[in-house]
Design a protein with these regions (language model features):
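A solvent-exposed interaction/effector surface
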Residues: 1-185
Length: 185
């Protein structure tokens, strides 16, 4: 059974992050210390109310990769050393939930990317992960994997993605709402 993938629209989410340009080979050793810096800031100097129950996040801006590792927060803030204010992107996304070992997280990314391409969606660039809270009895956690999509891009199934995440049929090369205006009465 494949990994279920859905398309939806998400709002930008403010984050406190440490940003870096790394290689994929060095990223596994770098993300932990980056995240530790963010948590030190949140515990020892963040503005009151900045953190209320956000999750750990990793944003991959490109293939370099330029990455941001941090935590969801409630608003933007002034930078404090290496910890800066940023945001997870908003807009149309393909998303799946990873429930297996972290070592297999790449499989979920491949599933989201492959599913999107197979349906004619154009990937828009950034992708990110939002780490859920650990289960108190097992220590296991889920990871939501998001890939940005170009809105309105027609799919091979004869549908188009709306900016709100809706999927509408294509009629005469136009989304149904537009196509219906151009049909003879």
């Amino acid at each position: 059974m494949g990994i279920p993938v859905t398309v939806k629209s998400v709002a930008p989410t403010p984050t406190a992050v440490v940003a870096a340009a790394v290689t994929w080979a060095e990223f596994p050793a770098r993300w932990g210390p980056m995240l530790d810096q963010v948590w030190r800031f949140i515990r020892n100097g963040a503005p009151e109310g900045l953190y209320q129950h956000g999750h750990n996040v990793m944003l991959y801006k490109d293939e370099v990769p330029n990455v941001e590792v941090g935590v969801q927060v409630t608003s933007s803030f002034d930078a404090a050393g290496p910890v800066v204010s940023s945001a997870l992107p908003g807009g149309l996304v393909a998303v799946a939930t990873h429930t297996g070992p972290v070592a297999e997280l790449g499989d979920t990314h491949q599933a989201v990317s492959g599913w999107s391409k197979a349906r004619g969606y154009q990937l828009a660039g950034p992708r990110w992960e939002v780490y859920g809270d650990p289960d108190p009895s097992t220590g296991r956690f889920t990871v939501e994997v998001y890939w940005s999509l170009e809105p309105g891009f027609p799919t091979e199934t004869g549908e188009a993605a709306g900016e709100d995440g809706s999927v509408v049929p294509i009629i005469g090369g136009l989304p149904a709402a537009e196509g219906s205006r151009h049909r003879p009465a």
